């Protein structure tokens, strides 16, 4: 049976592992390295380079060397984060035909999924060279805070690379698998994953082979690339102040700065000071003569820590939210597992130690542990690893828009996946023959404040009064975190469904903004939801009372009928005003009048039934019961 491999498709570096004799083994690539740079380049001769060969020629070929493409995967071109990236990278980011962010290299446009697929192909070939057989199946990891579009695009990349992606799993969860496979005692751990382009924090309970994710949070645009950028801008600003020339406008110089910044950042994890020496970084034209300029700068660890202090602090807010969602305090965490190359930075470790109040666990290789966890999950799926159960979660709430523009959540964030949930809704108007199902992702109370993932129509509903048709909406999130939504008319059996496509995915900025907005405007959201609910309640009551009055007006005396009509008019005026208190007050007043009408109808029926020789037809009893049911339903 062919082996299933585990791949950590990283922003900066990628890694592949396989189960070998019951333990995960990281496989060295053709250059003898255990990790491969996630870089793809196209030479002037049309040759495609992947990994270290691509990285080596980046300085001389910046336009056609693509790096950190994971930050673009599943992202729209118009996304603010995409636009930010266009200013930071030497290659060209273009707008794809579907509105997604693509890249231009070697005279062609490529989707981020295609570029990622080239790296995955390298991982596939690395595994095949080691195993001596063809590899067709893989488990691929993604940041825990990746949205549906990004997960789908990652799965597409695997398919382009010739791999059947058996499972997409979250990077912190994979790291926990590798960390806790041999641990039987129950523990609550935090996985702090600061990689090349993304940050994740996950809280898990592990023990007896069960790995249960309690909560997850993160920032999909925060990682080592941002640390490099901070150093690049620091060096460029220093050079501009000294020489009066902006190196950021020169693609070749920018690429050299980036390489030097990354190298300095790494060196300062073990040294207190480093010198950046870039001879002939640019030249000045003076009086027809060219004067070469050199960049020589000493950077200390303290300098670096000052430059990136804000970035490190940004990781703590998701940590606080993850702990709150899990319902535990930092003191209750038994172990903190560090994942991602940036966690080698002493300042990062110091901040993590201060936040959680304990020394972080450093017994795993932060660059390799995710791939090892992916290999373990591959072993589970293949049947080679027994007695391991992985319970992951979805990072954001999912729901649909209902009457009044309310976001009705079907699946809350941090719900264990795979999961499936159904709810029955009805029509908002009489004789409505079609409904539009609008699917949203986010934490805000009103649908318009969340991200629209997609929409579809369910048509052919038989004409009926509002509230009569039964439309069952089902949300289904698979083990990969990919969403399917369906709607079914229970009366006719007609069904329509949608799989959210990558082109409709959320941006990193959208997700972060949703959560921030939800906290910042919590009170405003509650008021808007309360207003929508008050309006829905009042309109529903008006509709029901008008219908009852129309059908039973002859059984109510003129005085009460006039009172009810006046109460209906006042309720309508309150609805038009949009005032919550007024709508609730007038709805209550109308409810009282409707109850009086129901009582009057009942007494009239009782009197008729009690009169000599009178018979109370069963049908009339049924009608009265139905009327009571209707009034009760709309209180």
From Swiss-Prot:
Name-wise, this protein is: Chaperone protein DnaK
Q: Name one GO molecular function term.
A: ATP binding
> What gene is behind this protein?
dnaK
InterPro entries, per database record: ATPase_NBD, Chaperone_DnaK, Heat_shock_70_CS, HSP70_C_sf, HSP70_peptide-bd_sf, Hsp_70_fam
Which HAMAP family does the record match to this protein? Answer: DnaK (MF_00332)
Job of this protein:
Acts as a chaperone.
Q: Where is the composition biased (Acidic residues)?
A: 622-635
Read off the PROSITE patterns from this record.
HSP70_1, HSP70_2, HSP70_3
Please give the residue ranges the record annotates as the region Disordered. Answer: 606-635
Q: Which SUPFAM superfamilies match?
A: Actin-like ATPase domain, Heat shock protein 70kD (HSP70), C-terminal subdomain, Heat shock protein 70kD (HSP70), peptide-binding domain
**Zinc-finger found in the keyword field:** no
- What induces this protein's gene, according to its Swiss-Prot or TrEMBL record? By stress conditions e.g. heat shock.
Give residues where Phosphothreonine occurs. Answer: 198
UniProt cross-references to Pfam families, sorted A to Z: HSP70
Sorted keywords for this record are: ATP-binding, Chaperone, Nucleotide-binding, Phosphoprotein, Stress response
* Family per record: Belongs to the heat shock protein 70 family.
Query: What is the source species?
Result: Novosphingobium aromaticivorans (strain ATCC 700278 / DSM 12444 / CCUG 56034 / CIP 105152 / NBRC 16084 / F199)
Chain coiled-coil ranges:
none
